Amino acid sequence: MPPVWNFITDFGDSAVTLPLALLVLIFLFAAGSRRLALAWMLAIGSCGAVIGALKILFGACGHELTFVHLTSPSGHTAMSTAVYGSLALLIGARLPLGQRRTILAATAIVIVGIAVSRVALHDHSRSEIALGFAVGVGAAALFRAALRRYAAPALPLGWLLIGGGVLVAVMHGTRWLIEPAVHRLALDFRLDLPFCR
């Protein structure tokens, strides 16, 4: 397997997305935008909670749901869509339409790249990618609704981008072993669910 897929997929690891989400949260609180900061926590937190719950639910079956090819929804895809997507919406909120579209398009390319890498590495099926993407889009939509209600603060975008870039560069390649922990938890919840058969 070409190493480029591992390089791309590492941008979606929780070791990158979660610290980046925390950095954005700090910037929002520092800018005095408490409501948007809370909305950010709700959006990213709900994404993590939902994808975690789905992983446990499907993992409790102990085998692939053959009719939809589902074993474990893609957390990389979900969190990448939520974090990178919401960050793009936040950065673009105070920019001209043309620049906003450019940022959203570039972000979409990154998210799609991460999603494709999960399939290329045989870590997830297309159905698992689609479900992860849907969860991430839901989280980003939640944050977008908050952006429409509360004005985006004048963040120091230069410092945010520098800080985010340094953080991603430092954490890229680090892998937090969340998936095995979720799998073990799923085994504890092994249930005889009708849709597992």
Q: Model regions: which residues?
A:
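Short helix-capping/hinge motifs at transmembrane helix termini and TM-loop junctions
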Residues: 31, 58-59, 122
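Membrane-embedded catalytic cores of phosphoryl/pyrophosphoryl-handling enzymes
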Residues: 34, 64-181
